[in-house]
């Protein structure tokens, strides 16, 4: 009986430590963000080769609305509840081809470029700036072309990443309309799946012991104007 109780308590604590990424700006949950498959159970993607590594969508349908943001500004992305596990936040953009609907575009192919990543503070343990936070300011590059975009939010939890397949990916995709901007086309684009391997040093890593003295973020370099 005690064993059963302990197992149930452990499972409950595990779920409560998970989170979703459901909202951008001043909108409501899942208004501008495509409803993720973890919207009820706060689960995660564990397979970097899964189609779910792209936007982790519960259904093929897009979100109800599109959030407007000015190039060169920032947009706030919200977690619910706050980020609990150690690991980096990363954000990618993908421009929707002209003539296609942002609400139905899948984001397939080498169309994603990274706009933000974070490095940990090194010491007795690795501490990422996102830990304990529930909102993040995502920079929208000033030089990119105006148009509709998908903004992919990703938190990679590394607390059990010492074994292959142990990293946990918390993901969602927001629908944006970017206004203003310039004419620059980012050259270093990746696809999801395809951008990561389960053996990448920023994915397969023991952050507990010995404590690393460096960290290599997975994916391409951050695009800068």
From Swiss-Prot:
<keyword id="KW-0186">Copper</keyword>
<keyword id="KW-0624">Polysaccharide degradation</keyword>
<comment type="similarity">
    <text>Belongs to the polysaccharide monooxygenase AA9 family.</text>
</comment>
<dbReference type="InterPro" id="IPR005103">
    <property type="entry name" value="AA9_LPMO"/>
</dbReference>
<dbReference type="GO" id="GO:0004497">
    <property type="term" value="F:monooxygenase activity"/>
</dbReference>
<keyword id="KW-0560">Oxidoreductase</keyword>
<keyword id="KW-0136">Cellulose degradation</keyword>
<dbReference type="GO" id="GO:0030245">
    <property type="term" value="P:cellulose catabolic process"/>
</dbReference>
<feature type="disulfide bond">
    <location>
        <begin position="143"/>
        <end position="225"/>
    </location>
</feature>
<keyword id="KW-0964">Secreted</keyword>
<feature type="binding site">
    <location>
        <position position="159"/>
    </location>
    <ligand>
        <name>O2</name>
    </ligand>
</feature>
<feature type="binding site">
    <location>
        <position position="170"/>
    </location>
    <ligand>
        <name>Cu(2+)</name>
    </ligand>
</feature>
<comment type="function">
    <text>Lytic polysaccharide monooxygenase (LPMO) that depolymerizes crystalline and amorphous polysaccharides via the oxidation of scissile alpha- or beta-(1-4)-glycosidic bonds, yielding C1 or C4 oxidation products. Catalysis by LPMOs requires the reduction of the active-site copper from Cu(II) to Cu(I) by a reducing agent and H(2)O(2) or O(2) as a cosubstrate. Shows oxidative cleavage of xylan in addition to cellulose. Shows a strong synergistic effect with endoglucanase I (EGI) with a 16-fold higher release of detected oligosaccharides.</text>
</comment>
<protein>
    <recommendedName>
        <fullName>AA9 family lytic polysaccharide monooxygenase A</fullName>
        <ecNumber>1.14.99.56</ecNumber>
    </recommendedName>
</protein>
<feature type="binding site">
    <location>
        <position position="85"/>
    </location>
    <ligand>
        <name>Cu(2+)</name>
    </ligand>
</feature>
<keyword id="KW-1015">Disulfide bond</keyword>
<dbReference type="GO" id="GO:0005576">
    <property type="term" value="C:extracellular region"/>
</dbReference>
<keyword id="KW-0479">Metal-binding</keyword>
<dbReference type="InterPro" id="IPR049892">
    <property type="entry name" value="AA9"/>
</dbReference>
<feature type="signal peptide">
    <location>
        <begin position="1"/>
        <end position="17"/>
    </location>
</feature>
<keyword id="KW-0732">Signal</keyword>
<feature type="disulfide bond">
    <location>
        <begin position="55"/>
        <end position="173"/>
    </location>
</feature>
<feature type="binding site">
    <location>
        <position position="168"/>
    </location>
    <ligand>
        <name>O2</name>
    </ligand>
</feature>
<feature type="binding site">
    <location>
        <position position="18"/>
    </location>
    <ligand>
        <name>Cu(2+)</name>
    </ligand>
</feature>
<dbReference type="Pfam" id="PF03443">
    <property type="entry name" value="AA9"/>
</dbReference>
<keyword id="KW-0503">Monooxygenase</keyword>
<dbReference type="GO" id="GO:0046872">
    <property type="term" value="F:metal ion binding"/>
</dbReference>
<keyword id="KW-0119">Carbohydrate metabolism</keyword>
């Amino acid at each position: 009986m005690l064993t059963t109780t302990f197992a149930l308590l452990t499972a409950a604590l595990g779920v409560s430590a998970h989170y979703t990424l459901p909202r951008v700006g001043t909108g409501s949950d899942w208004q501008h963000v495509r409803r993720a498959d973890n919207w009820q159970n706060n689960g995660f993607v564990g397979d970097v080769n899964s189609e779910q590594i792209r936007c982790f969508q519960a259904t093929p349908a897009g979100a109800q609305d599109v959030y407007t943001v000015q190039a060169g500004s920032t947009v706030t992305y919200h977690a619910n509840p706050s980020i609990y596990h150690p690991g980096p936040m990363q954000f990618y953009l993908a421009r929707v081809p002209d003539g296609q609907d942002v609400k139905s575009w899948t984001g397939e192919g080498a169309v994603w470029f990274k706009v933000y990543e974070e490095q940990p503070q090194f010491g007795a343990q690795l501490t990422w700036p996102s830990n304990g936070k529930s909102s993040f300011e995502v920079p929208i590059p000033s030089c990119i072309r105006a148009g509709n975009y998908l903004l992919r939010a990703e938190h990679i939890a590394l607390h059990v990443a010492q074994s292959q397949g142990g990293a946990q990916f918390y993901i969602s995709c927001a629908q944006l309309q970017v206004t203003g901007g310039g004419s620059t086309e980012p050259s270093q684009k990746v696809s999801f799946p395809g951008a990561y391997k389960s053996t990448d040093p920023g994915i397969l890593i023991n952050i507990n012991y010995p404590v690393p003295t460096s960290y290599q973020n997975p994916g391409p370099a951050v695009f800068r104007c």
